[in-house]
């Protein structure tokens, strides 16, 4: 059996970049890392509470954090930033003040920028949220997978693999179902692959969704 490594960590430094860009002393490193995680959780919670979406997709692709001595720059890459801005016109400023209070940024300024992604459904996080929303609404898993693949085809990707594991459709015995369209070369380091694993809580139990998207080869 081939052991499956996380495709993002496998390609770090070649086709994949870091989401946190900062340096620190080894003794302060863990603090910085925890702070990053808290910032990400805080932003996700805020967006979850304040975004009124019909599809249940929050649309956060990734959150990049850059730190300098006097500034923390947070860049939120979103698929549908319009929804957040429409539901809360002053949402970004509110979020900024919330984060500043949370982290007591006395000597550091915190700055938040929201960037829109060109093709939201070419991003595995947004797709996973879409599938999770469908599964919560008791749509059959095959239908949800097919729909997700249709959406990625519009975002002209070269291949996609979707895997759902757990008590699918509320069956007694948990199983793993997967579907692949196009090429997904996991062993080619040159291949630019985006990956995400997402947990969804349904009334039957927890389902795990994994998505690999093959974007292009360098």
From Swiss-Prot:
Residues forming the KH type-2 domain are 47-118
Broad class of the protein's primary localization? plastid
Enumerate the GO terms in the molecular function aspect: rRNA binding; structural constituent of ribosome
Q: Which positions are tagged coiled coil?
A: none
Question: What Gene3D superfamilies is this protein classified in?
Answer: 3.30.300.20, Ribosomal protein S3, C-terminal domain (3.30.1140.32)
Q: What GO CC terms are in its UniProt record?
A: chloroplast; ribonucleoprotein complex; ribosome
Q: Where in the cell is it found?
A: Plastid, Chloroplast
Q: Which UniProt keywords apply?
A: Chloroplast, Plastid, Ribonucleoprotein, Ribosomal protein, RNA-binding, rRNA-binding
Which GO biological process entries does UniProt record here? translation
- Cite the InterPro entries for this sequence: KH_dom-like_a/b, KH_dom_type_2, KH_sf_prok-type, Ribosomal_S3_C_sf, Ribosomal_uS3_bac-typ, Ribosomal_uS3_C, Ribosomal_uS3_CS
Q: How does it assemble?
A: Part of the 30S ribosomal subunit.
The UniProt entry's sequence similarity note says: Belongs to the universal ribosomal protein uS3 family.
What protein name does the entry list?
Answer: Small ribosomal subunit protein uS3c
Q: Which organism is it from?
A: Nicotiana tabacum
Q: What is the lineage of its organism?
A: Eukaryota, Viridiplantae, Streptophyta, Embryophyta, Tracheophyta
């Amino acid at each position: 059996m081939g052991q499956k490594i996380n495709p993002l960590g496998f390609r770090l430094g070649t086709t994949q970049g870091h989401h946190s860009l900062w340096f620190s002393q080894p003794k302060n490193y863990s603090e910085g890392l925890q702070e990053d995680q808290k910032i990400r959780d805080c932003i996700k919670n805020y967006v979850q509470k304040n975004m009124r979406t019909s599809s249940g997709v929050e649309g956060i692709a990734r959150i990049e954090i850059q730190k300098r001595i006097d500034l923390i720059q947070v860049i939120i890459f979103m698929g549908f930033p319009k929804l957040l801005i429409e539901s809360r016109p002053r949402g970004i400023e509110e979020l900024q003040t919330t984060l500043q209070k949370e982290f007591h940024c006395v000597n550091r300024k915190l700055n938040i920028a929201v960037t829109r992604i060109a093709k939201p459904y070419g991003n595995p996080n947004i797709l996973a949220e879409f599938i999770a929303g469908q599964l919560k609404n008791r749509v059959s898993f095959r239908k949800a997978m097919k729909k997700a693949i249709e959406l990625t085809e519009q975002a002209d990707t070269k291949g996609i693999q979707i895997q759902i594991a757990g008590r699918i459709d509320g069956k007694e015995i948990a199983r793993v179902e997967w579907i692949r369209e196009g090429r997904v070369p996991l062993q080619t380091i040159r291949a630019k692959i985006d990956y995400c694993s997402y947990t969804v809580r349904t009334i039957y139990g927890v389902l795990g969704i994994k998505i690999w998207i093959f974007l292009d080869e360098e």
